[in-house]
A protein has these predicted regions:
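Bacterial N-terminal signal peptides that target proteins for export
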Residues: 1-7
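C-terminal motif of bacterial Sec signal peptides marking the signal peptidase cleavage site
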Residues: 14-16
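Structured, acidic catalytic/metal-binding patches in enzyme active sites
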Residues: 20-27, 32-245
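A cross-kingdom marker for long, charged
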Residues: 239-297
Length: 297
């Protein structure tokens, strides 16, 4: 079922809002991820497409990236404080728990129950806790197992890498959304879609590795068309899902960027690479408003 494949990548696409474990280190090749510049007479905005989680040792920084970041006086990310675990827990308590839910094992097909039980054991989350969670929340709670299997580390992701030294330098960080906003994207999904999401988390590790490798390879090469194809393959089968996770958010961000041009300064915007690729990308929406984004890497 196509929706199952979509669900398997949703947690990765929105990984900034999910609980994530550490993993072992490993050397990885570098790359040249895509970057754009939007500017007028007194304002420059850099747009950099990120990967929220990466393998340790992945070398993705370039001189052009470092120059753009160093010249900026404001950093904008999807979420301003990625380390706010208390805030994330509070948002999860508010949105992710409901009374009277069926047991978590009853929310997947019979042939997936054993795999789900094994993942629960690997995650170390009590089944009784997951039983009280809405299906999307339980899927996110288990997503850390997938990240670990893929060899990913939240501390190696683009945002975490640049956030700490930026804050240490006393420069401001702004979030386009909050953790609660991102959890809310999942909370509004129909139960059928939430269960497909859970099945996708439980599905074959080999499939997840193959899909993620394609995404990571396109990102590292700066292959924007490849990124767009990956996200199109995963989301076009569900227009409602794509609208919620991509299109409406991109429109809001494009509106914010256009208004930000009214104030002088240099801004570095780091958001998930999928938002900067495809027909409903942030850049396309800016272009529709007469604002041009020029690729600089």
């Amino acid at each position: 079922m196509k929706l199952r494949r979509i669900s398997g990548l949703l947690a990765i696409a929105l990984a900034a809002c999910a609980p994530q474990p550490g993993v072992e280190r490993g050397e990885r090749p570098g790359g040249h991820p895509a970057m754009w510049r939007v500017a007028d007479a007194d304002t420059t905005i850099y747009l950099f497409g990120t990967f929220h989680l990466l393998p340790q040792g992945r070398d993705w920084r370039t001189p052009a990236f470092d120059r753009a970041l160093a010249s900026s006086d404001e950093l904008v990310m999807e979420i301003a404080d990625l380390g706010d675990q208390a805030g994330a827990a509070q948002a999860m308590m508010k949105l992710g728990l409901s009374p009277g839910l069926p047991p978590i094992l009853d929310r997947v097909p019979a042939e997936k129950k054993a795999a789900l039980q094994a993942m629960i054991a690997e995650a170390g989350v009590p089944t009784a806790v997951l039983d009280r969670m809405e299906t999307w929340a339980a899927a996110l709670a288990l997503a850390g197992v997938t990240y670990r299997r893929l060899g990913l580390d939240p501390n190696a992701g683009v945002e975490r890498t640049i956030e700490a030294p930026w804050k240490a330098g006393g420069k401001p960080v702004r979030g386009l959304e909050t953790v609660e906003d991102q959890f809310g994207l999942f909370d509004t999904l129909p139960e059928e879609a939430q269960r497909s999401f859970l099945v996708g988390i439980v599905d074959s590790p080999a499939d997840a590795k193959k899909q993620f490798a394609a995404m990571l390879d396109a990102w590292a090469k700066g292959d924007v068309a490849g990124i767009a194809r990956t996200f199109d393959d995963e989301t076009l089968a569900s227009p409602e899902l794509r609208a919620a996770l991509m299109t409406r958010r991109n429109a809001k961000w494009a509106d914010w960027l256009k208004k930000r041009l009214d104030r002088p300064g240099t801004v570095f915007v780091a958001v998930g690479a999928g938002h900067l690729a495809g027909n409903d990308s942030v850049q396309r929406m800016l272009a529709a408003e007469g604002v041009k984004a020029v690729r600089v890497q």
